[in-house]
């Protein structure tokens, strides 16, 4: 037994050394570091689904006073980047940033990833209403937030510019800049920013989005 003790001690020291080297290379990621700073931004570890009772989907429709009511699931869609990431709410409180998350990493988000496209106050523009929260996408600073819908808010109006790939470029009417994301983000999510409109499809910068079907909970068929 004594013959094996030195060998076992040596193996333990090597394992500890290897673990230390691996931990030295790990890169901590902070989601709050990736978005413009704002006193209105509140970051949470994950979306907290509302406990309020919801209206049956068959009673949903939009009203003329600018307040949003529910609607049939077929009236909703996702805004999907070329890498499959979906534009989504992350923190449920109003005036928080929007992000782009792949479906596989945002299944717990539920319907906050779905949007309804509606005419804006001006005929040629549109606004996007969240299915779960009833809030609207709004251009703010260098990115997008979600806030109470109002037809009088120009920051909530967007122009859809078609491309020859079937995708669209989403242009903020108030800022004249376009919604941009990183299609090869090193994290499982991507920041969403506003930048000069050029229809970019570069490796680290993309402005093309697809109006895709909504993500819905699937039911297994026995």
Curated annotation (Swiss-Prot):
Region forming the signal peptide: 1-15
GO cellular component: cell outer membrane
Record flagged with keyword Nucleus: no
Keyword Signal recorded: yes
Protein localization: Cell outer membrane
Annotated region described as Mediates binding to target cells, given as residue ranges: 90-101
One MF annotation (Gene Ontology) recorded for this entry: carbohydrate binding
Annotated region (Disordered), positions in chain: 22-44
Stored InterPro entries: CDtoxinA, CDtoxinA/C, Ricin_B-like_lectins
SUPFAM superfamilies: Ricin B-like lectins
Residue ranges of domain Ricin B-type lectin in the record: 122-211
Residue positions of covalent lipid attachment, annotated as S-diacylglycerol cysteine: 16
Record note on quaternary structure: Heterotrimer of 3 subunits, CdtA, CdtB and CdtC. May form higher oligomers.
Job description of the protein: CDTs are cytotoxins which induce host cell distension, growth arrest in G2/M phase, nucleus swelling, and chromatin fragmentation in HeLa cells.
Name assigned to this protein: Cytolethal distending toxin subunit A
Lineage, top ranks: Bacteria, Pseudomonadati, Pseudomonadota, Gammaproteobacteria, Pasteurellales
Record gene name: cdtA
